[in-house]
């Protein structure tokens, strides 16, 4: 019984350590300032998500027509709507700028979590190697064009970070289901 509680305490302390590292490097104090994030393509994504929240969600639409650019274009017909939905949910509690930044930071945290989950040996023990690999991946600055790391996510490629995280989680659950039905 003592070994179970010792492992649980160790697991919780490891998770808290990696969460603390993320919180310290992601500057959560800046996330909760009510301003509009900028950098890279971020400004263009703000317009699209703002249109989604103000025009589409009151009508319970996921996609529709936007008159913002090019004399109008179909918005969210060919683009990933989950970040806009997440921003809408947080916008019910927080102002738009804070809700948008929470959605962006969540994508980075989800990437680290998905890499850690993919490298776990058991489902209840945190993988130190996985969490470390996730942090190294997120903090790498050498491949900003590919997305998924912090530099590209803050430049507006947060949709790619979500897709990368969901791909890792899909692989994890496929492996887990294969092992369960063996």
Feature-to-residue mapping (PLM):
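Start-transfer (signal-anchor) and selected internal transmembrane alpha helices
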Residues: 1-29
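Glutamate identity and glutamate-enriched acidic tracts
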Residues: 1-2, 14, 33, 116, ...
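Positively charged n-region of N-terminal signal peptides that target proteins for export
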Residues: 2-6, 120-121, 176-181
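Membrane-interfacial loop-to-transmembrane alpha-helix junctions, especially the N-terminal start
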Residues: 11-16, 125-130, 181-182
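Active-site lumenal/periplasmic loops and adjacent helix-entry segments of GT-C-fold
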Residues: 25-168
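Membrane-interface transmembrane helices that cradle and orient dolichyl/undecaprenyl
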Residues: 162-182
